[in-house]
């Protein structure tokens, strides 16, 4: 007679377990749905921050579950699959940190650790203020706007400024490149009192190099002073 205990749940036990925890499961799934669907930097920074935390937790959770699967495999085939998936999860997680650290060294922005993208936009205003923003890819054109004295780019609130504060060049950094955008067009309203209420600027991609933002200086001042 075997001394091992059979821990397999039958159908009735599974149904009973679901009935006991269905409210928690519903609330948890609703929370994830709201976070993933409405978590955009252009909508709510609070929900977006929660979304980033959830995404950060997914890789360690995947690795932990993979390790458990390796320790308690259902069979030999399951063990091989668990090892492959766990190694893939570990390599992906390490690769994320390597790329994020490289990007952080280039632009010195905490947006570098955004798990949704691999690029950070940067605008150094002529008043010395540094504005960084999340961007999903490296576009050919960037169009920041000023509305009611507030600077927006890619739909994100950046800072309060005047049209004269926009620089000639802005940047989009990736782990291995610095993309330089040159101002090619600007519109600062009409001759009425709307001049300071609305302005739009067009920056076209000018060149690409491997420099860091620390090498950029405006008026003899370091970028981070």
Swiss-Prot record:
Segments crossing the lipid bilayer: 21-41, 52-72, 78-98
Gene name per UniProt: M
Recorded family membership: Belongs to the gammacoronaviruses M protein family.
Subunit structure of this chain's protein: Homomultimer. Interacts with envelope E protein in the budding compartment of the host cell, which is located between endoplasmic reticulum and the Golgi complex. Forms a complex with HE and S proteins. Interacts with nucleocapsid N protein. This interaction probably participates in RNA packaging into the virus.
Alphabetical keyword list: Glycoprotein, Host Golgi apparatus, Host membrane, Membrane, Transmembrane, Transmembrane helix, Viral envelope protein, Viral matrix protein, Virion
Annotated source species: Avian infectious bronchitis virus (strain Beaudette M42) (IBV)
Main location as per UniProt: virion
Protein name, per record: Membrane protein
Molecular function as annotated in GO: structural constituent of virion
A GO cellular-component term linked to this record: host cell Golgi membrane
Keyword Glycoprotein: yes
């Amino acid at each position: 007679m075997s001394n091992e205990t059979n821990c397999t749940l039958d159908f009735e036990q599974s149904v009973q377990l679901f009935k006991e925890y269905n409210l928690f499961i519903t609330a948890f799934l609703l929370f994830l749905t709201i976070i993933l669907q409405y978590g955009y930097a252009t909508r709510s920074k609070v929900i977006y921050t929660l979304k980033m935390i959830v995404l950060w937790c997914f890789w360690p959770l995947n690795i932990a579950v993979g390790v458990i699967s390796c320790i308690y495999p259902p069979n030999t085939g399951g063990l091989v699959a668990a090892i492959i998936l766990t190694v893939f999860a570990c390599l992906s997680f390490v690769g994320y940190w390597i790329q994020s650290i490289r990007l952080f060294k280039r632009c010195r922005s905490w947006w570098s650790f955004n798990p949704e993208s691999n690029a950070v936009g940067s605008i150094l205003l002529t008043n010395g203020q540094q504005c960084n923003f999340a961007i999903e890819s490296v576009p050919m054109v960037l169009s920041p706007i000023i509305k009611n004295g507030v600077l927006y780019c890619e739909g994100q609130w950046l800072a309060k400024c005047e049209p004269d504060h926009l620089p000639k060049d802005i940047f989009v950094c990736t782990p291995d490149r610095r993309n330089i955008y040159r101002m090619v067009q600007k519109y600062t309203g009409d001759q009425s009192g709307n001049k300071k209420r609305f302005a739009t600027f067009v920056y076209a991609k000018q060149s690409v190099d491997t420099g860091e933002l620390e090498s950029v200086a405006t008026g003899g001042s370091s970028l981070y002073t």
